[in-house]
Amino acid sequence: TNVFQNVMLETMADREDVVAISAAMPTGTGLSAVAEQYPDRFFDVGIAEEHAVTFAAGLALGGSRPVVALYSTFLQRAYDQILHDVCIGSLPVVFAVDRAGLVGSDGETHQGIFDIAFLSQMPNLTVMAPKNSQELEDMFSFAFAQEGPVAIRYSRGAAYDGLSDHREAIRVGRSEWIHTGRDIAVIAVGSMV
């Protein structure tokens, strides 16, 4: 979340078209500093994830580059809006999917375990999961360069800084081999790498 916050502050300093949207979670998603520094480009729509996504679609149609920051478990509330309002039209909306995966102390309602399943079937949507903080930064740079929607899912807690010697350019549809062996294959996504 801190890495995302820093990426947003740096990006918004460089690009006036980038706006941030929260659904009553600016502190939890790392957008409170964005709200303070860029109050005219930060929107908190309240507990209304569906509205957050439709609002982002409208802003994208108007020329903005919206970033919708939501907890994974609450993003599923906006399934129809993601599909119909953003993905079918291939609008340039970035979804910052916070608390993806198991989140322990947040309780059973906050486990972000369905986002890969429902986001991966969306047309025109690129879904990514960084293995470390450098890759998270690179994925947001990649997302802002795209003409269509991108979802970046990341776990709660401190960002992992290991495996930085494996830094490569972000390419869609590519996996990364960390170690090669002959007996078994271990497949991991995001912070589990």
Predicted regions and their residues:
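A short, charged/proline- and glycine-enriched loop
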Residues: D14-V18, H179-I184
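Short boundary motifs at domain starts and secondary-structure transition points
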Residues: L9-E10, S175-H179
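Glycine-rich phosphate/diphosphate-binding loop of Rossmann-like nucleotide-binding domains
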Residues: A185-V193
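A generic structural signal for well-ordered coil/turn residues at beta-strand boundaries
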Residues: Q146-G148, R171, T180-D183
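Short, small-residue-rich loop/turn micro-motifs
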Residues: A24, Y154-R156, G190
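Aromatic-enriched
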Residues: A158-E176
